[in-house]
């Protein structure tokens, strides 16, 4: 290559560099400023005040402990209506009940589906208790949203991103349970799918994680409740029933959850737990639930004294 060719090549290369679009530099954070977390929309850096989620007229995250109670599974119309009346009389704010059940074994009771949704809606009409129930896949979202006030994503579905994207489009609040092996960041990033997709009404639920311990069904991570309340503006509730798997442990862990500042409790209650079609071992009977509610009220009153 002669000198003229070299000069021409350099000239062309310089002109090309001037005309090319260089990527814009990322903004530089001030010295000492915390880096934004990956869960931007769920972070308290984005929103300082706790989000208050309205579920059928019940405010979750407003500073008062919200109690959601009812059977693991809706088994019959009389069962769910009787349970609804009795948990309301004891002081529950919302009615829980499973219509679609994601069981570990395919041979276990899988729920009554749409029929159970209709019975839940009837119980709400009679008692005035808003309904929380689980949705398993995106094909069922619309029908569940027609009957329920708070749509639950179970622990097994925390990272079902197709389901989360669908739930982000509905005008109903979502209760997002933590997966049994999920880190706190993974849990909050799952919530980010809902928030970034357009649904700002998200409630988080700690329901125990899987550890080496086998004496209980799961290990209730109360430290996570306190930490997530620091990291995120989303309200956090606790499910002491699934967290322990033993009805004798539900009341003390419910009180402990309230003590660390959770925004609500999700408690399984059955009129005859020993006859329940699912999770009877962790379900309180109505009398035990009433006693727990009395204890929670007394402790709340003492805390305010």
Residue ranges and their predicted role:
Residues 91, 143-152, 168-174, 195-201, ...:
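Glycine-enriched alpha-helix->loop->beta-strand junction motifs that scaffold or abut catalytic
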Residues 109-133, 167-173, 222-236, 282-304:
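Alpha-helix-loop-beta-strand connector modules within alpha/beta enzyme cores
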């Amino acid at each position: 290559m002669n000198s003229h060719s070299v000069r021409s090549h350099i000239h062309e290369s310089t002109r090309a560099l001037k005309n090319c679009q260089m990527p814009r530099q990322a903004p530089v954070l001030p010295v000492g400023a915390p880096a934004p977390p990956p869960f931007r929309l769920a972070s308290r850096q984005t929103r300082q005040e706790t989000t208050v989620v309205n579920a059928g007229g019940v405010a979750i995250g407003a500073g008062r402990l919200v109690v959601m109670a009812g059977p693991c599974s809706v088994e019959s119309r009389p069962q769910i209506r009787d349970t609804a009346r009795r948990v309301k009389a004891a002081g529950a704010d919302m009615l829980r009940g499973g219509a679609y059940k994601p069981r570990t074994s395919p041979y276990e009771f899988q729920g009554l589906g749409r029929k159970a949704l209709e019975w839940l809606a009837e119980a709400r009409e009679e008692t005035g208790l808003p309904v929380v129930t689980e949705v398993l896949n995106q094909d069922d979202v619309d029908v569940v949203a027609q009957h329920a006030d708070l749509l639950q994503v179970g622990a097994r579905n925390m990272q079902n991103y197709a389901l989360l994207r669908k739930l982000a489009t509905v005008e109903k609040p979502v209760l997002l349970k933590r997966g049994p092996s999920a880190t706190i960041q993974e849990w909050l990033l799952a919530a980010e799918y809902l928030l970034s997709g357009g649904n700002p009404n998200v409630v988080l639920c700690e329901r125990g994680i899987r550890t080496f311990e086998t004496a209980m069904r799961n290990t209730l991570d109360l430290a996570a409740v306190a930490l997530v309340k620091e990291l995120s503006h989303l309200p956090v509730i606790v499910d002491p029933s699934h967290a322990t798997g033993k009805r004798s442990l539900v009341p003390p862990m419910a009180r402990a959850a309230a003590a660390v500042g959770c925004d609500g409790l999700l408690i399984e209650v059955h009129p005859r737990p020993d006859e329940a079609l699912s999770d009877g071992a962790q379900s309180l009977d109505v009398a035990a639930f009433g006693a727990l509610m009395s204890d929670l009220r007394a402790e709340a009153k003492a805390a305010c004294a």
